[in-house]
Amino acid sequence: MTTILTSTFRNLSTTSKWALRFSVRPLSCSSQVQSAPAVQTKSKKTLAKPNLKNIVVVEGVRIPFLLSGTSYKDLMPHDLARAALSGLLYRTNIPKDVVDYIIFGTVIQEVKTSNVAREAALGAGFSDKTPAHTVTMACISSNQAMTTAVGLIASGQCDVVVAGGVELMSDVPIRHSRNMRKMMLDLNKAKTLAQRLSLLTKFRLNFLSPELPAVAEFSTNETMGHSADRLAAAFAVSRMEQDKYALRSHSLAKKAQDEGHLSDIVPFKVPGKDTVSKDNGIRPSSLEQMAKLKPAFIKPYGTVTAANSSFLTDGASAMLIMSEDRALAMGYKPKAYLRDFIYVSQDPKDQLLLGPTYATPKVLEKAGLTMNDIDAFEFHEAFSGQILANFKAMDSDWFAQNYMGRKTKVGAPPLEKFNIWGGSLSLGHPFGATGCRLVMAAANRLRKDGGQYALVAACAAGGQGHAMIVEAYPK
């Protein structure tokens, strides 16, 4: 695969053998926004399993997702996480001391609050007797928080768990250089003035150069944007297709926002500023305007631009997960069941963003479902090219047989069921918080349209991925 992808991108004017296989059927992502047809209610089996607890989502919320450098720029990550937790408490009226455990996902750690889950929980007024821990798994960090909660409840360790995620891209940690850090530590250990002066003679001006957070994959030294560009080229996804898909995402998000479908948002009164009540990254444009943008990563021939990529985002989400018995005993009407889930990983060099392709057939088999059983799809949109490349891979028998060891393709999701309230391209992508947003969008869509099953999937740095089946709770 490495050879195929590398040769494909070295000469974009020449279509590789792999690209040829994926250039036959273009994907239609019309810029015209159309209402998705109502889900046809079908009599389906439940995925409840004998002798296993039913685990439910009672409610999930998020503060508005904002472009980094805007209204949240003067805050810390635990401020955002605390706001999401406070919103969940307000929305559910759950007694704080009933919560057994709190788990939050995050990617870029704030050194002052290394366990942001605990600090946010204390700030939101939860009992100091309630344990909390933080997990990190790149863009599926809050997915990991949710499934960890499922495990705690399924094993009988807990009945009530809050899971969530947070990311603040407005203020990422910037360190001193390694040489400067070593000198500062040595100076701190020095016992005499002579020792300190001796150390200072080794100082060089380049020690003052800051060490910025890594944007490239550690194992491959390639940015995700570069990977997205190569993936789009290998799967013959054109710039026009990518721009059309991005426009679709923004247009659908704007429509959902105007029609009140983004009901998981809770307003946040930013200290010293106005109350924020809606996402601010939704920007329907035109294909003509988008076409003017230059490639963002591989120049001059790349196809990934600022318009067809997700943007740096600040935000937080939180979800109340309970055993069904406990939820009903407390008088709650759950929104959905959390059913089967799976994590996958593959080559981070050439399959970095193909997590949904690998995870989807596995989770469907685990649940005993097919693509036709799914009423709502919610996939994380890192890049337009990533989504469309996954579609082509999922819809290819050749790819399934040669790279996945499967006899047949799983099939691509139908667009009329796919991310119809927008996605990460338009709503934003706070790395640690997106997973909870995906699950709540899936649950709310099932509830609104009368569907029974939703499939949530996401890719993540390191060549990892996740998929989960969400089942509607009976009305």
UniProtKB/Swiss-Prot annotation:
It holds the Pfam family Thiolase_C. Residues 1-34 form a transit peptide. It comes from the Eukaryota. The keyword Phosphoprotein does not apply. Residues 174-221 dip into the membrane without crossing it. CDD domains: thiolase. Pathway: Lipid metabolism; fatty acid beta-oxidation. One of its GO terms (molecular function) is acetyl-CoA C-acetyltransferase activity. The modification N6-succinyllysine is found at residues 53, 73, 189, 191, 273, 292, 294, 333. Mitochondrial trifunctional enzyme catalyzes the last three of the four reactions of the mitochondrial beta-oxidation pathway. The mitochondrial beta-oxidation pathway is the major energy-producing process in tissues and is performed through four consecutive reactions breaking down fatty acids into acetyl-CoA. Among the enzymes involved in this pathway, the trifunctional enzyme exhibits specificity for long-chain fatty acids. Belongs to the thiolase-like superfamily. Thiolase family. This is Trifunctional enzyme subunit beta, mitochondrial. The gene is Hadhb.
